Curated annotation (Swiss-Prot):
Substrate binds at R100, E175, F222, E223, Q224, M225, E226, E331, P332, S333, L334, G335. Catalyzes the attachment of glycine to tRNA(Gly). GO terms for biological process: glycyl-tRNA aminoacylation. It comes from Clostridium acetobutylicum (strain ATCC 824 / DSM 792 / JCM 1419 / IAM 19013 / LMG 5710 / NBRC 13948 / NRRL B-527 / VKM B-1787 / 2291 / W). The gene is glyQS. The lineage of its organism: Bacteria, Bacillati, Bacillota, Clostridia, Eubacteriales. This is Glycine--tRNA ligase. CDD domains: GlyRS-like_core, GlyRS_anticodon. Its main location: cytoplasm. Its EC number is 6.1.1.14. It holds the Pfam family tRNA-synt_2b. Keywords: Aminoacyl-tRNA synthetase, ATP-binding, Cytoplasm, Ligase, Nucleotide-binding, Protein biosynthesis.
Amino acid sequence: MKDEKTMDKIVSLAKNRGFVFAGSEIYGGLANSWDYGPLGVELKNNVKKLWWKKFVQDNTYNVGLDCAILMNSEVWVASGHLGGFSDPLMDCKECKSRFRADKIVEDYLTEQGAEVASADGWSNEKLENFIKDKHIKCPKCGKENFTSIRKFNLMFKTFQGVTEDASSEIYLRPETAQGIFVNFKNVQRSSRKKVPFGIGQIGKAFRNEITPGNFTFRTREFEQMELEFFCKPGTDLEWFKYWKDYCWSFLLDLGINKENLRFRDHSAEELVFYSKATSDIEYKFPFGWGELWGVADRTDYDLKKHMDHSGEDMNYLDPSTNEKYVPYVIEPSLGADRVALAFLIDAYDEEELEGGDQRIVLHFHPQIAPIKAAVLPLSKKLSEKALDVYSKISSKFNIEYDETGSIGKRYRRQDEIGTPYCITVDFDTLEDEAVTIRDRDSMSQVRVKIEELEKYLEEKIK
């Protein structure tokens, strides 16, 4: 019987095999800071490349953009982030620990087995009353003695230039979306795009989260993959459904187990005031269901706010009808770190083998696997031939070469990092110019001519 898949096992594997390390580890680390190791950076880069291909390159509606992290502070005034981008905080009067009130409520709902454990959109009064009525205790000391809720702004502030005063204050962006909105007219004009069209962007964002956690699920520094899709008012709900289905298929096509995914539509109470509809694709993490991908109908709120604040006209003139309007926006927003974690968790498996043996294997889809194949000489005496095989395919695929240890242990290591194929160079290779290819999932083996190796891998890794 398989053991339960736990976050402790995932974190241990991630560190030991070079997916993710604690940030600044030799100095005691930095809370909730993570560095991607050799395999982790390949995994995340593969996910980003595949997102870009599906959402920008392969979709005729969309183009790409890469905006600056540091922006004029007026952007954040107009967007409402400076005035309203905050978390509801409560302090425990006994142990002085600080918590997000909505997270205390959500954790309680999860413990009680609620199907939907969300407190999004709850007022401060509702949060406080719920905590009091349910006698929810401090997660740290177990006492029931909280302060009233107060708001805490999530933006990281710094200064630009040589002086540190109000005139030089700037902020690390808390989302990539606003850079797209302020460039709406630039992109539309220069690319000659007609509505409907979208602008995609991948980039870092920063939020001074009070209660980050669950490994790379919620961090203060993270990477977003966002699309802002501009459409004519009245067609927005049709496009909202289109992008929901598009996002869903992206995850399934890359092998995520459908049973671990669900849509959760936001209730009227949860919706931010400008949103017409919001739906999250949630993944069943070991710690519970968590948001993976948010798809929102933001209406014309963002463009109108920037038009009002900047004085720049954000209206679009339809060349077919001569109708002028501010486009509505559908936003599918995905965290690269969060979805990479979901792929890692979903791929993890502990298999019982014949004879009572066990192996850990990551069943990555070949397209997201960090290493596509490993070249393994059966003996160090075959290194020269094995390196020749490696050189024939390493320019086309991300290939690993390993000649250390028994062939069985090398197979197990490749299973554990999710390598789909192991290419064994044996003494027969010197005679027949063929290699043995072992499949990660079935552990079956086939003999393939070296001259046909590249074609074989191309057909398998697509």
